[in-house]
Amino acid sequence: MNNILGYKNENVVVTGAASGMGAGCVERLLEIGANVYALDINEVTAPVTRSITVNIMDRDSIAAAVAELPDQIYSVFNCAGVPCPPVPAYNTVMINFVGMRELTEQLLSRMKRNGSIASVASTAGMAWRSNMENVEKFLANDSFESADAWLKTEEGAALSADAYAFSKQCMIVYMFNNTAQLARKHIRINTICPSPTESAFSQQMEEIGLGKDVTDMFTPSNGQYANGGDMGDALVAINSSLFRFVSGCLIPVDWGYTAEITAGQRDNLLNISL
């Protein structure tokens, strides 16, 4: 098998592996010979090296999952995520960001030289620049416990009320803040911002009234919705050895939607900035 992407016989970790973009990653990684360690609260049916049940908003569950992972890891794919609503705001930030950060940081000591981390943010998080003060205030709570406690305060609940966008803004700024220190460890970190993607996630959105009449406003000019495989392939490419000098990048995977906004061809409904 041609190993141009560098994954053959390498250990990789995928969260949210049971469905959507995580499942898309798993499928492609298996095809190209990676040893896939799949983490999800739901059952993973793909023939992975190991499937591990984890509740990513629970620190003890994360620690137990990490204990089942190998000593050396080449790549991490942070794909676990939930929408808000219907998921409560506190749970959304804990799953989408706090748990993601905890897992990632517990794995850093196991990552190989020239290892890589890729996380799934969202175009909804690309207003990070205009909300930087609040995001940095939250990120100053740099432990699982302090972040958990802050979200339960009156201030924390208010500042994270738009929980889905806030959690993705935190993910983006966290990447920027940690690129340099990870570079010194020869580890890359990048984040993608997908355009609307058909998945179990999008079905949940439709159930609360945010159907395609809303999400159509955020699709590229070809009107096309992505699928989990489209985003999975992008993540696999970004974490691969072909992208070995790419780090600290916020990468829209949206067939040009962000470019259209940057060029002034579309209304900037989400206050997007790169």
Which sequence ranges carry the predicted segments?
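Short C-terminal tail/terminal secondary-structure segment
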Residues: 2, 247-274
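Short, flexible catalytic-loop segment of classical short-chain dehydrogenase/reductase
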Residues: 193-204
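Rossmann-fold cofactor-recognition segment
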Residues: 46-62
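Catalytic loop of short-chain dehydrogenase/reductase
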Residues: 82-86, 113-184, 196-197
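C-terminal helical subdomain
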Residues: 102, 191, 210-246, 251-255, ...
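Canonical Rossmann dinucleotide-binding motif of NAD(H)/NADP(H)-dependent dehydrogenases/reductases
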Residues: 2-37
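Rossmann-fold scaffold of SDR-type NAD(P)-dependent oxidoreductases
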Residues: 15-16, 73-81, 114-122, 190-194
